[in-house]
Amino acid sequence: KATLLDGSYHPVDSSEQAFKMAAHIAYKQGLAQAQPCLLEPICLVKVILDDASTGDIMTVINKRRGTVLGMNPSEEEQGMTELDAQMPQSEITDLATVVRQITRGLGHFTAQFDHYEQLPQALEADVIANAPKFSEYEG
């Protein structure tokens, strides 16, 4: 959304098309000056798992750009560990299957949106390359 703060009209040089083109150029210049970045959703993940599987699950979380926040004995299930982590939402898609495989069906997890973080630059180019293309000016 943009708000035009000042402008002028001339009966010969002003037309709807001229204003549309001026708005398009101003938008592109403003966007470039704003230095935009891509954000990705980060989720809080809570994994309940058997004690023997904690190392393997921590490896999975780290490989998926996650951060382990802490581990505690589970208050809900005796002999189990509760692992808290933050992970990008895009890395959680098949986590249920992975947790079940590593824990031999004993583990489970929950995920809840927490905040947004800037997408790493290494992944930004891939996202941009795979984004749908729009015409330069759709007037």
Feature-to-residue mapping (PLM):
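Accessory interaction regions appended to the cores of large information-processing enzymes
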Residues: K1-G139
